[in-house]
């Protein structure tokens, strides 16, 4: 029954024991920031998943099957956004200048659900510094499953590259952390 909230286990992720960096990444699979997070996780063989609209709907058509996403029962973007916020421990929003549309909704849902939120303005930092900020956020808030959100590609053409670089660097930090026995 897809009307019931997912658990991290249903998404294929484990909240696991305490550690310094996340054990899984989720997003809604939209073009831009969402898909970049999944691409970075898949490239690093890092656990990922999340919720997407029914029919795997995105602005570029159907979200490719290579992205391990579960479908909500409706085609509404807000429903999948709400599920990803609720089923994660905290959210990273990567954006440029101002929050708008679904990105603004994600921030509002985090506040409503009392979920930790880290905002990264690409105009104010570079991907390496941003990843360190996110690592500190994840550590401070005890986040095991990190939701990643931000503008779709049509709203910010650089969202894919910047977000992929941030999440890729974060996952490299996670690997180094694990290699040093901190996980």
Question: PLM features: residue spans?
Answer:
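Compositionally biased non-globular segments, especially hydrophobic aliphatic-rich helices
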Residues: 8-10, 182
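Acidic/glycine-enriched connector segments
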Residues: 11-145, 152-155, 159-177
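Divalent-metal-activated hydrolytic enzyme cores
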Residues: 177-183
């Amino acid at each position: 029954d897809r009307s019931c909230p997912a658990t991290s286990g249903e998404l294929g992720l484990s909240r696991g024991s305490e550690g310094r960096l996340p054990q899984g990444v989720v997003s809604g699979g939209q073009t831009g920031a969402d898909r970049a997070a999944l691409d970075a996780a898949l490239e690093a063989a890092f656990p990922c998943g999340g919720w997407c609209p029914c029919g795997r709907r995105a602005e570029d058509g159907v979200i490719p099957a290579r992205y391990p996403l579960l479908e909500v029962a409706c085609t509404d973007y807000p429903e999948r956004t709400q599920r990803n916020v609720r089923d994660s421990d905290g959210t990273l929003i990567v954006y440029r200048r101002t929050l708008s549309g679904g990105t603004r909704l994600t921030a509002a849902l985090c506040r409503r659900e009392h979920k930790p939120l880290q905002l990264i303005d690409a105009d104010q930092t570079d991907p390496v510094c941003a990843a360190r900020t996110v690592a500190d956020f994840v550590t401070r808030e005890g986040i095991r499953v990190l939701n990643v959100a931000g503008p779709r590609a049509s709203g910010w053409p650089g969202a894919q590259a910047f977000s992929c670089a941030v999440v890729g660097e974060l996952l490299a930090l996670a690997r180094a952390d694990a290699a040093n026995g901190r996980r």
